[in-house]
Amino acid sequence: MRLKKVMATGLVAALALSTMVGCSSKKDSSDQKKIGVVQLVEHDALDASYKGFKDGLEKAGYKDGDKIKIEYKNAQNEQSNCQTIAKQFVTDKCDLVLAIATPAAQAMANESKDIPILVTAVTDPADAKLVQSNKK
């Protein structure tokens, strides 16, 4: 069941990227979409989320270094590092951010209202004040 959720996250990311990636076949690095990944801490479940995200993107045709450039940052279980990383992703003008774990998602949401943010490993997004409601 958890694997399905992880793969679903990757597929959602691929769909989000497909709206941002043009039809150009040119492989200039300036055409690459920047994806930031902020992970709170190294942990098997969180690592699996990141792996599922990358696998889902690759399955949808988005390989790191080709159409996209993934910048992975681990906050080493320091919330202040999450904030610093989030600020850096805003400065870098990432096109999409994957936030893994609640503090990472909260830091990213506090820093940007313009960058699409995918969250995973968040038990209750509404309780974490990431969304107004968990209902559609």
Regions found by a protein language model. Name each.
Residues 2-14, 18-19, 23-136:
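Short hydrophobic alpha-helices and adjacent helix-cap/hinge residues
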